[in-house]
């Protein structure tokens, strides 16, 4: 049960990580689309820097903090990176560079990237998210939809090392294999 829960939560977090910031940007451009009861997600403070630039700068800043943590001696890396993130985050919100909502969503995305199995998968999601952000900022709804289409086409037509689609076992559909991918099963008992 625990293994299945972790697999499903990892998949859900990957999906949320991809959609969170582009959807937020789209809803800030079209605030009338924010569902009732979710008005709290709207940016209330004055926006000095356009939201797209805030999101892109924070994507870059998060990578800068990761690189700084990698190049810092082990004993100092965790406390130093936490302190840097707190101080820089607090200063950037108080000075008006970034809005607190943007900082919150990007903090979630940054932490959620560590839930993926591999570093490459985390960066693949990041690059596709950035493409979707830029397309949404330029073309609005059509850019948002276009970013999703680009992701779907990339997943469908790029091949893994085993020459299967990244969407396998969904495309082509293989029900038993899909069950194994989503739900962790017990290993067969050792034969005597």
What would you call each of these model-derived segments?
Residues 13-29, 45-120, 124-125, 130-136:
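Transmembrane alpha-helix detector for multi-pass membrane proteins
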């Amino acid at each position: 049960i625990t293994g299945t829960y972790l697999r499903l939560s990892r998949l859900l977090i990957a999906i949320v990580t991809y959609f969170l910031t582009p959807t937020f940007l789209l809803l800030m451009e079209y605030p009338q689309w924010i569902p009732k009861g979710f008005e709290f997600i709207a940016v209330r403070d004055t926006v000095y820097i356009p939201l797209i630039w805030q999101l892109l700068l924070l994507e870059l800043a998060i990578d800068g903090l990761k690189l700084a943590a990698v190049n810092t001696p082990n004993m100092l890396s965790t406390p130093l990176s936490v302190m840097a993130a707190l101080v820089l985050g607090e200063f950037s919100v108080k000075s008006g560079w970034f809005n607190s909502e943007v900082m919150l969503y990007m903090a979630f995305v940054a932490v959620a990237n560590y839930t993926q199995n591999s570093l490459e998968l985390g960066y693949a999601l990041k690059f596709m998210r950035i493409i979707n952000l830029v397309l949404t900022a330029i073309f609005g709804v059509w850019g948002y939809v276009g970013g999703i289409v680009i992701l779907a086409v990339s997943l469908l037509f790029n091949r893994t090392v085993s020459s299967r689609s990244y969407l396998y076992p969904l495309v082509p559909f293989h029900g038993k294999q899909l069950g194994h991918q989503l739900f962790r099963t017990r290993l067969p008992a050792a034969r005597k």
